[in-house]
Amino acid sequence: MTQLEKACAISFKGEMKMELLEAIRQRHSVRSYLDKPIDTDVRNALCKYIDECNQEGNLHIQLIENEPQAFAKRLYHYGLFSNVKNYIALVGKEDATLNERCGYYGEKIVLKAQMLGLNTCWVGGTYKKI
C-alpha cells in the first residue's frame, strides 16, 4: 500500500479507496459551469457530507445555492468565473486552528464533490455578506 493509499484510507473512513484515489487524480480547478441545478441526489449526498464535516471539525460550512452575485465580477488573482450559482462557504469561529480546519475539511468536501461528479475551484479570502 502506498503512502497516498494509507492516507486516503485514514482520512476518508468508509469511502471506496479507489474512488478517492481516482478523484484525487481527476480533480482540477474549473471556472466555467453549466447553467443547470445540482441533481437532488447529488445535493443531498453533498449536504450530508458537509454536515458530517461540520460536526467533526466544529465548523459551519454551508452549501449556498442559486446565488449568482458572489462571482458575477472578476475576482482579483482568480480571473473570470462563468455561471457560478452554487458555492460552498467555509465558515467557523476565529481561532488558531480555523485556517487548518477549513483547509482540511474543505479539501475533503472538494474531493467528495468530485466523486459525485461536480467540478470545483478553490477561491480564498474574506468576502462581504450577500
Where are these regions (language model features)?
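Acidic, surface-exposed loops and disordered segments
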Residues: 6-130
